[in-house]
């Protein structure tokens, strides 16, 4: 019997006793107390090492879950989100979903490959050199417009900001991939006497809008979302995923990089400011700089970046990637990694020279992998 089938039987038991105070109040990743009295978080079973291992052992042995452990799980049940039952998992046992991590670590998963170039602020990037860039298209007041950006992270998922999706699910209907110059049907560059052109752009619909459960628009917290495409988009020369900071080493590196890149068409709630894909350098700032600028504490879930040059932030897309090259899973050549997401309050072109707050992607890899696993790869 498959683990999922065994769990289905177990869940039937657990539902009866899941009306406790903890299960009634818990949300994804909420703090909770395990039946053993340990501090934990409300997580899907596949993200809890001890629970997954125990159930896997039972499955391999062809046994039912022991009655005492079934009772433990009944008490640990803390909620159901996206059709998946969650359990209070000890903090030390929380793990990234193994299926999604296998996808990201597969040797054929060609993420973060980029063409290097010397970049001055506001310069056009080379054709197809940032193949993960995505444009989000909205239908508003009878007009179709690109109002946000994002980054491709798999054949079915785009990573963007929650503020680009929240309250706009009925307007946001399509993703464009493989774009360079918006106004031209075909994107080409002259190389000597030869003209090299990129394949056509791909426009694809959206199956699911997945916003972080704790997104707080007022305080710009947990500003992260996933868009599940309505079909897989095969990787091509001009359409490939960016890498994510999926290891502790990469997560820590976010605080060590001195200069990041923002890439985009300057797409914001007011439209696009550039017809062609641009890139600019933005410096990492201490969180104290943003604390002073925004008069509040800046948590680890956000990065403080930019300031100085008034035009720096104009090149990025709202919801687009804050990126930098880094060593990825032991590979020799650096890969481009998305360390941050352009959040609200960042794209303030020509206004006061303030650093911006970016969503720290490394703090949300758990959420990304859990959400992808719950909604289908």
Swiss-Prot record:
Predominant location: secreted
Signal peptide, first to last residue: 1-26
Domain (Peptidase S1): residue spans on this chain: 119-373
Entry EC number(s): 3.4.21.-
Biological-process GO terms, alphabetical: defense response to fungus; defense response to Gram-positive bacterium; innate immune response; positive regulation of antibacterial peptide biosynthetic process; positive regulation of antifungal peptide production; proteolysis; Toll receptor ligand protein activation cascade
Effect of gene knockout: Results in increased susceptibility to fungal or Gram-positive bacterial infection and failure to induce the expression of the Toll pathway-activated antifungal peptide Drs. siRNA-mediated knockdown results in increased susceptibility to Gram-positive bacterial infection and severe reduction in the expression of the antifungal peptide Drs. In a protease psh mutant background, complete loss of Drs induction and increased susceptibility to Gram-positive bacterial infection.
Disulfide partners: 32-88, 42-78, 48-89, 111-243, 148-164, 188-197, 290-304, 314-349
Keyword hit for Plastid: no
PTM summary: Proteolytically cleaved by a tryspin-like protease which is likely to activate grass.
UniProt GO cellular component terms: extracellular region; extracellular space
Annotated glycan sites: 230, 270
Binding-site residues for Ca(2+), renumbered to this chain: 179, 181, 184, 187
Active-site residues, record numbering mapped to chain: 163 (charge relay system), 223 (charge relay system), 318 (charge relay system)
Annotated coiled-coil segments of the chain: none
Entry remark concerning the domains of this protein: The clip domain consists of 35-55 residues which are 'knitted' together usually by 3 conserved disulfide bonds forming a clip-like compact structure.
Protein name per Swiss-Prot or TrEMBL: Serine protease grass
Origin species: Drosophila melanogaster
């Amino acid at each position: 019997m498959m683990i999922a089938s065994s769990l289905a039987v177990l869940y039937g038991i657990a539902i009866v006793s899941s009306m406790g105070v903890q299960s009634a109040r818990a949300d994804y990743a909420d703090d909770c107390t395990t039946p053993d009295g340990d501090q934990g978080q409300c997580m899907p079973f596949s993200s809890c090492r001890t629970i997954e291992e125990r159930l896997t052992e039972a499955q391999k042995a062809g046994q039912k879950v022991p009655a005492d452990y079934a009772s433990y799980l009944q008490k640990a049940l803390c909620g159901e989100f996206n059709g998946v039952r969650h359990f209070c998992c000890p903090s030390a046992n929380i793990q990234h979903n193994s299926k999604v991590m296998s996808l990201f670590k597969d040797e054929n998963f060609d993420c973060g490959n980029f063409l290097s170039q010397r970049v001055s602020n506001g310069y056009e990037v080379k054709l197809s050199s940032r193949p993960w860039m995505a444009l989000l298209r909205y239908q508003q007041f009878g007009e179709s417009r690109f109002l946000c950006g994002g980054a491709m992270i798999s054949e079915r998922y785009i990573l963007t900001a929650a503020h680009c999706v929240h309250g706009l699910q009925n307007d946001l209907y399509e993703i464009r991939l493989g774009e360079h110059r918006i106004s031209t049907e075909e994107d080409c560059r002259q190389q000597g006497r030869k003209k090299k052109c990129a394949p056509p752009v791909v426009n694809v619909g959206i199956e699911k809008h997945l916003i972080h459960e704790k997104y707080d628009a007022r305080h710009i917290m947990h500003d992260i979302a996933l868009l599940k495409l309505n079909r897989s988009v095969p990787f091509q020369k001009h359409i490939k995923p960016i890498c994510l900071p999926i290891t502790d080493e990469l997560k820590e590196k976010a605080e060590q990089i001195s200069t990041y890149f923002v890439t985009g068409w300057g797409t914001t709630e007011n439209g696009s400011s550039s017809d062609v894909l641009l890139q600019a350098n933005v410096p990492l700032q201490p969180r104290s700089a943003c604390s002073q600028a925004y008069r509040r504490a800046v948590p680890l879930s956000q990065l403080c970046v930019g300031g100085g040059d008034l035009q720096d932030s104009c090149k990025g897309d709202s919801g687009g990637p804050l990126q930098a090259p880094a060593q990825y899973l032991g590979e020799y050549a650096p890969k481009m990694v998305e360390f941050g997401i352009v959040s609200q309050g960042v794209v303030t072109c020509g206004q006061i020279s303030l650093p911006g707050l970016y969503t720290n992607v490394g703090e949300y890899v758990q959420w990304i992998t859990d959400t992808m696993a719950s909604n289908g790869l």
